[in-house]
């Protein structure tokens, strides 16, 4: 069976592994998931990510990040634009997550970027997810 929303699947796997204090979480690889993982690492929400070749297909393995007293780096993840209801934002209406404390991941014509980068570059796009 095909997956309807692979990005939502990725976010759910991250959310569940984070709640259970797992060190790593594996998921099927795609370029967009790798770009999302890159953004999460750059913003300090995950420790790292790598691509593993399995016999059947590639896997994206994400290493989660926790503080010294096991506090989670990711407090929340939310999928915004879904296959049934797409959400777009113009450059003047880019969302702010928790008043600027969180990050919105936006798919633009210039690639995936955070809300701050999109505002700096003056581009809008599809709002994929919120991370805080």
From Swiss-Prot:
One of its GO terms (biological process) is translation. Keywords: Ribonucleoprotein, Ribosomal protein, RNA-binding, rRNA-binding. Coiled coil: none annotated. SUPFAM superfamilies: Ribosomal protein S8 (SSF56047). Pfam families: Ribosomal_S8. PANTHER family: 40S RIBOSOMAL PROTEIN S15A. Belongs to the universal ribosomal protein uS8 family. Part of the 30S ribosomal subunit. Contacts proteins S5 and S12. This is Small ribosomal subunit protein uS8. It comes from Thermobifida fusca (strain YX). The lineage of its organism: Bacteria, Bacillati, Actinomycetota, Actinomycetes, Streptosporangiales.
